[in-house]
Swiss-Prot record:
Native source organism of the sequence: Yersinia enterocolitica serotype O:8 / biotype 1B (strain NCTC 13174 / 8081)
Organism domain of life: Bacteria
Name of the encoding gene: ispF
Binding residue positions for 4-CDP-2-C-methyl-D-erythritol 2-phosphate: 8-10, 36-37, 58-60, 63-67, 102-108, 134-137, 141, 144
Family: Belongs to the IspF family.
Record's protein name: 2-C-methyl-D-erythritol 2,4-cyclodiphosphate synthase
Cofactor binding description: Binds 1 divalent metal cation per subunit.
UniProt keyword terms in alphabetical order: Isoprene biosynthesis, Lyase, Metal-binding
Subunit structure: Homotrimer.
Pathway annotation from the record: Isoprenoid biosynthesis; isopentenyl diphosphate biosynthesis via DXP pathway; isopentenyl diphosphate from 1-deoxy-D-xylulose 5-phosphate: step 4/6
Function comment: Involved in the biosynthesis of isopentenyl diphosphate (IPP) and dimethylallyl diphosphate (DMAPP), two major building blocks of isoprenoid compounds. Catalyzes the conversion of 4-diphosphocytidyl-2-C-methyl-D-erythritol 2-phosphate (CDP-ME2P) to 2-C-methyl-D-erythritol 2,4-cyclodiphosphate (ME-CPP) with a corresponding release of cytidine 5-monophosphate (CMP).
GO biological process, one term: terpenoid biosynthetic process
Keyword Membrane appears in the UniProt entry: no
Annotated site (Transition state stabilizer): 36, 135
Length: 162
């Protein structure tokens, strides 16, 4: 078994800068996150956790923000490509736990769909995926509504060869 940790943060743009995409879900909100890709902090943290567990570097190494090919990239596609590499290395997901840190908008109504997307992309059961959200009680940049942060922990299991 191998454990990986991922972290990501993105700053909000101005009003009308949307869309806001978290966990592969488009969330109604007046601001989007500024990023080279679609800015999905949950999927970026999850991808980093998975890559870290497999010792495959990080999302910035695999999909550099200096490469125009990844401008506006769908983070679900990046996650699927990272997981393809993990499978090729002989590992599969054991479980994934994600914590979204945001003062607003409320994430709870969107978490079930986030779990569905993650289970689809990682070819696993929804019971292997946990997503939760918290605030920082109006402290720090997330508490002031300047951006969203996310942490993820992934467990990979070595696939037995027949």
């Amino acid at each position: 078994m191998r454990i990986g940790h991922g972290f990501d943060v993105h700053k909000f743009g101005e009003n009308g800068s949307g869309p806001l995409i978290i966990g592969g879900v488009r969330i109604p909100y007046e601001k989007g996150l500024l990023a080279h890709s679609d800015g999905d902090v949950a999927l970026h943290a999850a991808t980093d956790a998975l890559l870290g567990a497999a010792a495959l570097g990080d999302i910035g190494k695999l999909f550099p923000d200096t490469d125009p090919a990844f401008k506006g990239a769908d983070s679900r596609a990046l996650l699927r490509e990272a997981y393809r590499r993990i499978l090729a290395k002989g590992y599969r997901l054991g479980n994934l736990d994600i914590t979204i840190i945001a003062q607003a908008p409320k994430m709870a109504p969107h978490i079930p769909q986030m779990r569905v997307h993650l289970a689809e992309d990682l070819q696993c059961h929804m019971d292997d995926i946990n997503v939760k959200a918290t605030t920082t009680e109006q402290l720090g940049f997330t508490g002031r509504g300047e951006g969203i942060a996310c942490e993820a922990v992934a467990l990979l299991i070595k696939v037995e060869q027949a």
